[in-house]
């Protein structure tokens, strides 16, 4: 069983968060999509995608799944890669 933390879990600025952001950005570019294209597919503003890609916004699991579907990558494979990275 894991250790119970007595302080909030840091997300933004961790190695895993940086890798997740880089992966999303790379997958979007590989798909030939612009930030505005992804934003429109998800009924969001372009700034929402930009904040995620700059690592300035946390990403929920549901948002990650929506991004993966809109961009066209396998979220399970992506998370396996991210999970191997140590913070």
List each language-model region with its residue ranges.
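N-terminal flexible/basic segments that precede or flank functional cores
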Residues: 1-26, 30, 69, 74-80, ...
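Residues that mark the N-terminal boundary/hinge immediately upstream of a DNA-recognition element
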Residues: 23, 34, 60-63
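Residue-level detection of the helix-turn-helix DNA-binding "recognition helix"
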Residues: 29, 43, 54-56, 83
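Short alpha-helical DNA-recognition segment
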Residues: 32-51
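Charged, amphipathic alpha-helical coiled-coil/dimerization segments
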Residues: 36, 53, 69-72
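Short Asp/Glu-rich motifs
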Residues: 47, 58, 87
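Short, basic-rich loop-to-helix N-cap that marks the start of a DNA-contacting helix
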Residues: 56-68
């Amino acid at each position: 069983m894991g250790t119970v933390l007595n302080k909030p879990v840091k997300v933004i600025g961790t190695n895993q968060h940086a890798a997740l952001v880089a992966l999303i950005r790379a997958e979007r570019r590989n798909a030939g999509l612009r930030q505005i294209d992804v934003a429109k597919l998800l009924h969001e503003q372009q700034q929402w995608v930009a904040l995620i890609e700059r690592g300035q916004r946390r990403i929920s699991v549901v948002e990650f799944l929506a991004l993966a579907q809109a961009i066209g990558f396998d979220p399970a494979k992506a998370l396996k890669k991210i999970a191997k990275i140590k913070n």
